[in-house]
Amino acid sequence: MKHSYFISDLHLSETQPELTALFVDFMQNLAPQAERLYILGDLFDFWIGDDEQSTLIQQVKDLIKSVSEQGVQCYFQHGNRDFLIGERFAKDTGVQLFPDYQLITLYDKKILLCHGDTLCIDDVAYQQFRRRVHQKWLQRLFLCLPLKVRLKIAEKIRAKSNQDKQAKTQEIMDINQAFTTEKVQEFGVNLLIHGHTHREAIHQQAGFTRIVLGDWRKNYASILKIDESGEFGFIKD
């Protein structure tokens, strides 16, 4: 039966080879069987520019390109860790880049996709930071810096982010229900899929279904499957 996959929040890095191994297995064995593959952000733990080269980056690019060349339509939506992924990455892999909110039609069903961080409006400090780093002039300036400098800046930002999380409640870092409902109504859908919060779940809410993609861990890959009959669910071992 025809089907598509949705993944997010893999946070791939050279310090966690077990996550890369899970991704390799998925891309070599499951992904080629799908019609479409949607990656909803934070594929990488951080991204400092399309010009960065590493063994991991090349491996991931090659895997996505291979799946794309096998006829799978691949899509990428930026996360809060890899929002600097650009057109060069898209060209190298064959993915189509999505904006922050993307409306798709899959098997006659309208679905709203987003990474999920834009729904967490109660985290005021993060939203202020997000607005700053998404300014195009600042991004252009950052990308003009030497790679080593960019890497140091990214490491400092990541460390501060991890520190700040310790002082925030789970409620603040979760989506705002009222705002999320407004977004769903704005786009006129009854199915929303997002990641970011790392809380894999399928929520039946008033008037719509909200599917939250989980983060990938040492022994678990969070993979959502939707087939042409309209059935959906997370793949379990």
UniProtKB/Swiss-Prot annotation:
Its EC number is 3.6.1.54. Mn(2+) 2 binds at residues 42, 80, 115, 196. Binds 2 Mn(2+) ions per subunit in a binuclear metal center. It is found in: Cell inner membrane. It catalyses: UDP-2-N,3-O-bis[(3R)-3-hydroxytetradecanoyl]-alpha-D-glucosamine + H2O = 2-N,3-O-bis[(3R)-3-hydroxytetradecanoyl]-alpha-D-glucosaminyl 1-phosphate + UMP + 2 H(+). It is a peripheral membrane protein. It comes from the Bacteria. It is an enzyme of class 3 (hydrolase). SUPFAM superfamilies: Metallo-dependent phosphatases (SSF56300). It comes from Haemophilus influenzae (strain PittEE). Belongs to the LpxH family. This is UDP-2,3-diacylglucosamine hydrolase.
